[in-house]
Amino acid sequence: MIKVLIADDQELIRESLKIVLGTHEDIDVVGTAADGVEVLKCLELKQVDVILMDIRMPKLDGVMATKEVKAKYPDTKIIILTTFDDDDFVFSALRYGASGYLLKGVSMDELYKAIVTVN
């Protein structure tokens, strides 16, 4: 079972991803977070294999959250979800240890395959 945390400041995106990913028997969405601070709090309480991380979030953005997650939990994989594919924020997150990125709007099949692949 792959334990997934969804981090996005838009509730609709968080809940939609949770519902869709919940249809896969090998994925367990163990939590959602609205910002990077909530991501770090979740990781203190739960074991997470893969984080789906938005880049632009309040309080602690996806870049700095990626840096902190990889420093404290180096085995946790991070897939960046973004609306921009040439964004400097994305490249910064990749430098800090994100496993890859996907554009928002990607098919759910591609998202599922990415989660399985990085895990």
PLM segments and residue spans:
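Active-site beta3 strand of CheY-like receiver
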Residues: K46-L52
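Short amphipathic alpha-helix used as the core "switch/output" element in two-component signaling
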Residues: K41-C42, V63-D75
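C-terminal output helix
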Residues: D88, V106-N119
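The feature encodes the CheY-like receiver
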Residues: I13, M53, P58
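Active-site residues of response regulator receiver
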Residues: D8, D54, T82
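Acidic catalytic/metal-coordinating carboxylates
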Residues: D35-E38, K59-M64
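Two-component/phosphorelay signaling modules centered on CheY-like receiver
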Residues: E11-G31
